[in-house]
Each structure stands twice: as C-alpha cells, then as structure tokens.
Amino acid sequence: MLDSLKNFLSELTGGEKHPDRFEQNDYRLAAAALLIHASTIDGNMTGSEREKLHALLKSRFELDDAATEELIDVSTLAENEAVDLYRFTSLINRTLDEPGRLGIVEMMWEMIFADGRVNEFEDNLMWRVADLLGVSSRDRIALRRRVAGETAESSGAQES
C-alpha cells in the first residue's frame, strides 16, 4: 500500500521512478532474500559474509554500489517479514528458467561457503531451497562441490 501511495505521489509530481527500484515481484529481491537467509541461518552475518553478499549481488545482477545496498536493504526487510521460503522460491520459479535457478543455488552455496564452513542448518536450507526450485539433488551436490573447490583454491591462493 505504501508503494502504491509513493507511486501515486510520484506520478502527480511528475517524478520519475528510480530505475534500480526493486519491486516485490523482482526475482533479484527474492534471490537476495534467500542469500540473506542463508547468511543468517547460523545466527548472524559475519563481515566476510556481508562482503560476499555485496560482491555476489553487484556482479551477478550488474548493479552499482548504491543499487546493491538498496537491494540488500529491501531484501533484508522482505526476509525478516517472510514466514517461509515459498514466497521467494515461487517467484524465482515463475521468472527464471533452469539455468537461472541453478545460478541462484550456486550463489547460495557461495554465500554459505563465505565463512569457510557449512553447518547442518545451512545444508538443510540448501536441500529445501533446491527442492523448491526444482533443482535435482545431483545438481545441488555438483554445485556444492564446485563452489567448495573454488573456495578452497582461492583460500590457498590468498595464503601463498
């Protein structure tokens, strides 16, 4: 309702809608909310997870820093208000094809591996989200292994 009022007032004053505004039906908002959920399921978001979230959203969705922060803010609110994951996964299913959904699962694994470990809550979340997105167990596990391998390689390169 608040969005409708803002849009109405904007139209009356001749103002333009901000091009990076994220509506409730924007799959990027749904994807970001899932990433936020993944990063906070183990208690809180670490600094490395926050940096990874910003980098993932900025690069995958080709956003500038301000739009990325706006997406994080809007998605955090949406995730805090959500009672389940279906709100986000159903939007992603309606919007993205299989390669797009696989990309979301890959982003979530990257988010989960940002702190260097995967706990049982994160693993269960990935199983549930992948299932809701229609991603097979085989693909989910293959993406996990690929991201884990890339994470290990980048950690080894940084230590050298």
Residue ranges and their predicted role:
Residues M1-H37, I41, T46-S160:
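Small-residue-enriched hydrophobic alpha-helices in membranes
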